[in-house]
């Protein structure tokens, strides 16, 4: 799998925005910033870490992954499944910042 295809989009929710700002504003010795992104379904933690190293030139300290199963919805009285998707929460130490709009 190409590393450019691993990271799809940033997840913009209230909780993901709180994870970014809480880590950046911490008063402890190490500042940990967490970014939430939507990744390819077949990507694993090591591929996600390598993709961040290559694309954004920063090394993540940890990667947490969650898989979401697509729900079955109805369209014109027929069941139509939504696709499965995967979310990754990537943690950086020392307040590393990423600009997703610049790298797109």
UniProtKB/Swiss-Prot annotation:
InterPro entries: Nucleotide-bd_a/b_plait_sf, Ribosomal_uL23-like, Ribosomal_uL23/eL15/eS24_sf. Gene3D superfamilies: 3.30.70.330. Transmembrane segments: none annotated. GO terms for molecular function: rRNA binding; structural constituent of ribosome. Signal peptide: none annotated. Keywords: Ribonucleoprotein, Ribosomal protein, RNA-binding, rRNA-binding. The keyword Cell cycle does not apply. One of its GO terms (biological process) is translation. It comes from the Bacteria. GO terms for cellular component: ribonucleoprotein complex; ribosome. Part of the 50S ribosomal subunit. Contacts protein L29, and trigger factor when it is bound to the ribosome. Belongs to the universal ribosomal protein uL23 family. One of the early assembly proteins it binds 23S rRNA. One of the proteins that surrounds the polypeptide exit tunnel on the outside of the ribosome. Forms the main docking site for trigger factor binding to the ribosome. This is Large ribosomal subunit protein uL23.
């Amino acid at each position: 799998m190409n590393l450019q295809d691993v990271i799809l989009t940033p997840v913009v929710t209230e909780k993901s925005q709180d994870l970014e700002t809480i880590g950046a504003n911490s008063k402890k010795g190490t500042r940990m910033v967490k970014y939430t992104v939507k990744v390819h379904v077949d990507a694993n933690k090591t591929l996600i870490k390598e993709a961040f190293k290559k694309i954004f030139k920063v090394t993540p300290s940890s990667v947490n992954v969650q898989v979401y199963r697509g729900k079955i919805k109805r369209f014109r009285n027929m069941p139509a499944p939504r696709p499965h998707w995967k979310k990754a929460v990537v943690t950086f130490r020392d307040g590393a910042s990423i600009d997703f709009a610049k790298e797109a």
